[in-house]
From Swiss-Prot:
Signal peptide stretch: none
Ranges of Polar residues composition bias in the record: 180-190
One Pfam assignment: DUF480
Family: Belongs to the UPF0502 family.
Protein name, entry field: UPF0502 protein Ssed_2611
């Protein structure tokens, strides 16, 4: 089952804050909501209420993706992810993979160049090639975690997206490819007429060739 938009945002924020602000991690409901609604480094920008954040957290807790933690003597409940890299997680990611998955959850489809530029606080990539190699390992995972999208007109590089949330477009690619046969079927009468005309023309040309051969034979004899 894929993550909803709100669930994906919660997981992405917990992944991000665990690395960028470890002193504030785990996050309270208020801090998590603020992180989800950041206007920078988020796409799309959301306006989640604490109730909506709590609903996403509750759903993730039922799926064992998030757990709550409260300090001794503290009345504030805080949350941390169990999405990856814990003893309870099936998914184990390298620091490079972790950074890219986090960015894709928070900002949607991005090119390798964009991912390298935006990953500085999470992980240092030597160059774009290093990003591409990491993306390849994620794409070849079983099941695949990321997917390369077709290059958009006017863009030099293709974007990659995560396949963890419902926002991913990877599932729509086969549907787009299937539209080609339908278009061909719509044009089939026109194609059939052209084939008939072409066949008649070939037959006529063949007759003319036979006549020319006969005329040439008479001249030579």
């Amino acid at each position: 089952m894929k993550l909803t938009l709100h669930e994906a945002r919660v997981i992405g924020c917990l992944l991000e804050k665990e690395v960028t602000t470890p002193e504030q991690y785990p996050l309270s409901l208020n801090s998590l909501t603020l992180a989800c609604n950041q206007k920078s480094s988020r796409e799309p920008v959301l306006s989640m209420t604490e109730t909506e954040t709590q609903m996403a957290v509750d759903s993730l807790m039922k799926r064992r993706q998030v757990t709550d933690q409260s300090g001794f003597g503290s009345r504030v409940v805080k949350y941390k992810h169990r999405f990856c890299n814990t003893e309870f997680s099936d998914l184990q990611l390298s620091p490079a993979q972790y950074a890219l998955v986090c960015l894709l959850l928070l900002r949607g489809p991005q090119t390798p160049g964009e991912l390298r530029t935006r990953s500085n606080r999470l992980h240092h990539f030597e160059d774009v090639a290093a990003v591409e190699r990491t993306l390849l390992t994620l794409a070849q995972a079983d099941p695949a975690i990321v997917h390369q999208l077709a290059r958009e007109p006017g863009r030099r590089d293709s974007c990659y997206e995560e396949l963890i949330s419902e926002q991913s477009k990877g599932v729509s690619a086969p549907i787009l490819k299937q539209s080609a046969p339908a278009q061909q079927s719509d044009n089939s009468p026109h194609t059939s007429d052209e084939m008939e005309k072409l066949s008649a023309r070939v037959t006529l040309l063949e007759k003319e060739v036979v006549m020319l051969k006969e005329a040439l034979h008479e001249l030579l004899n």
